[in-house]
């Protein structure tokens, strides 16, 4: 064991004795290490870095394009919303106009129906009045005939004589009815 410790101690002492440092390798190591490093650096610089830049540029363009498309879509949506709101306002205005026209038309129809009803009512009243006057005239004429006949019958009964002369009879009846009309003016 002592021998192995001695060997380790000698190994540590060897690099220091030869003048080589652990921190500073020999020049040939540095040159041979720089050559693969430079080759890798050139390959990286010529092949990997341009592809990486291309991917980054493409991604940046895609992001910018996406933002522009999103802004365009947002502007289009905003324009569509404004158009929709304008159409909605126009539809509401049109609906209000239609309601107002319907109200006015309803009032016109109501007025027309009232006028027609009044005309029909007046026509019915006038027709009823004409019928009533005609019936009244008919009743008055019937009553005159009946009264004439009753007065002749009464006169015959009172006189005890039969009044056979039509001319006398009609003259007597006409005088009686004329007297009756003067007593009750307008046939009332």
Swiss-Prot record:
Record-linked CDD domains: ATP-synt_Fo_b (cd06503)
Sample GO molecular function, one term: proton-transporting ATPase activity, rotational mechanism
Gene3D superfamilies in the record: F1F0 ATP synthase subunit B, membrane domain (1.20.5.620)
UniProt KW keywords: ATP synthesis, Cell membrane, CF(0), Hydrogen ion transport, Ion transport, Membrane, Transmembrane, Transmembrane helix, Transport
Highest taxon in the source lineage: Bacteria
SUPFAM superfamilies cross-referenced by the UniProt entry: F1F0 ATP synthase subunit B, membrane domain
Membrane-spanning ranges: 30-50
Cell location: Cell membrane
Disulfide cysteine pairs (residue numbers): none
Membrane topology, as annotated: Single-pass membrane protein
Pfam families in the record: ATP-synt_B (PF00430)
InterPro entries assigned to the protein according to its UniProt record, in alphabetical order: ATP_synth_B-like_membr_sf, ATP_synth_b/b'su_bac/chlpt, ATP_synth_F0_bsu_bac, ATP_synthase_B_chain
Gene Ontology cellular component list: plasma membrane; proton-transporting ATP synthase complex
Quaternary structure and partners: F-type ATPases have 2 components, F(1) - the catalytic core - and F(0) - the membrane proton channel. F(1) has five subunits: alpha(3), beta(3), gamma(1), delta(1), epsilon(1). F(0) has three main subunits: a(1), b(2) and c(10-14). The alpha and beta chains form an alternating ring which encloses part of the gamma chain. F(1) is attached to F(0) by a central stalk formed by the gamma and epsilon chains, while a peripheral stalk is formed by the delta and b chains.
Known function: F(1)F(0) ATP synthase produces ATP from ADP in the presence of a proton or sodium gradient. F-type ATPases consist of two structural domains, F(1) containing the extramembraneous catalytic core and F(0) containing the membrane proton channel, linked together by a central stalk and a peripheral stalk. During catalysis, ATP synthesis in the catalytic domain of F(1) is coupled via a rotary mechanism of the central stalk subunits to proton translocation.
Family as reported in the entry's similarity comment: Belongs to the ATPase B chain family.
HAMAP family referenced in this protein's UniProt entry, alphabetically: ATP_synth_b_bprime
The protein's name in its UniProt record: ATP synthase subunit b
Annotated source species: Corynebacterium glutamicum (strain ATCC 13032 / DSM 20300 / JCM 1318 / BCRC 11384 / CCUG 27702 / LMG 3730 / NBRC 12168 / NCIMB 10025 / NRRL B-2784 / 534)
């Amino acid at each position: 064991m002592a021998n192995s410790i001695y060997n380790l101690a000698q190994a540590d002492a060897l690099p220091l004795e030869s003048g080589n440092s652990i921190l500073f390798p020999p020049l040939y190591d540095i040159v041979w290490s720089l050559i693969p490093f430079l080759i890798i650096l050139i390959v990286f610089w010529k092949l990997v870095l341009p592809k990486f830049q291309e991917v980054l540029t493409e991604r940046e363009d895609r992001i910018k394009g996406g933002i522009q498309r999103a802004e365009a879509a947002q502007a289009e949506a905003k324009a569509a919303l404004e158009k929709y709101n304008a159409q909605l306002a126009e539809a509401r205005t049109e609906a209000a106009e239609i309601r107002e026209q319907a109200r006015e038309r309803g009032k016109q129809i109501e007025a027309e129906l009232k006028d027609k009803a009044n005309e029909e009512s007046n026509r019915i009243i006038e027709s009823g009045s004409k019928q009533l006057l005609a019936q009244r005239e008919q009743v008055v004429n019937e009553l005159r005939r009946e009264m004439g006949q009753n007065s002749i019958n009464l006169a015959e009964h009172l006189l005890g004589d039969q009044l056979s002369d039509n001319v006398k009879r009609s003259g007597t009846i006409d005088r009686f009815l004329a007297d009756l009309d003067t007593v009750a003016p307008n046939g009332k």
